[in-house]
């Protein structure tokens, strides 16, 4: 497993990438249902998957919750092969059809989290991109294995992208109440759906003013 979270590599990448992203993403609006959990255990951000941008959107969430901690993102091995440089930014490749691949990824993450228990792990249990209004979301059970084996605080995260009155979309991110690491995939899926529905309801109420009306911080 050649992945690692290299802070110099992340800083160099983001020096160029974040300005590029700002020209293509109008804003990332984040709201939290509760203050962040204590940093004595890892965080697992379990989110729906609506776009190529989602990992970078959740990087903004991680900056707010644990800005100085490493962040690891679980990605399909096939997708990671297209962007091998992501390995230096903590991206871990997994082939869901291969128990050995899953076991190696878990072993790598457990070792890294023992070194830095305040780390964050990003996981997209759908395994592929779907629109935010899809119901059910279709979470795979692998998220249960990662949450339990990593002994993590689990945060359900709903993501929705909306163009509003700008060319570039605004990402609305709703982070729910923390859950125990023994959570079932079905319950986690329901909680993420609840967060997405809250975003969609907010957009239905506020329309093009949603970006300005969004309750940044703890709601």
Language-model features: locations:
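Membrane-anchoring hydrophobic helices of lipid-metabolizing enzymes
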Residues: 1-59, 70-71, 81-91, 110, ...
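Non-catalytic C-terminal accessory region of glycerolipid acyltransferases
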Residues: 2-5, 103-219
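Structural motif
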Residues: 44-46, 93, 120-124
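Short glycine-enriched loops at secondary-structure junctions
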Residues: 51, 75-80, 159-163
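Short helix-capping segments at alpha-helix termini
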Residues: 64-67
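Generic beta-sheet signal
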Residues: 74-76, 94-96, 157
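Surface-exposed cleft-lining segments at the edges of enzyme active sites
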Residues: 91-98, 129-134
